[in-house]
Amino acid sequence: WAGEINTETNPYEAGLGFAVSLKKEKFHGKDAAIAAQSNLSRKLVAITFDDMTCVPFGSEPIRIGSKIVGRIKSGGQGYTIKKAIAYAYLPIEHTGVGTSVDVEFFGNWRTGVICAEPLFDPANERIRC
């Protein structure tokens, strides 16, 4: 994780809602956590690019069709999956796995795809005891 989590995001947007327990009767921030959980307008997604030279640094614009829908938060090379990887918050309606997005790299638009996580070994088949 890099710039994906800060004071402008919440755990539910970042896919970390499992780490928030709302079972206590009262605690500071409980009302805000409940509101955040029920009013999600965006979600953190993983975007991959087949071209390993398309490595985003962050802040690159993302468009779907002709509309800018977000900006890259962080990126890097996924050596194990042999793809470039980026993370971005996108409006909920654009977060479906398989959705194509265009990202601007140094003045050129390149197509990436929203992918399910984890990107590596999603079935946990490589874990060995």
Predicted regions and their residues:
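Conserved, structured C-terminal
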Residues: W1-C129
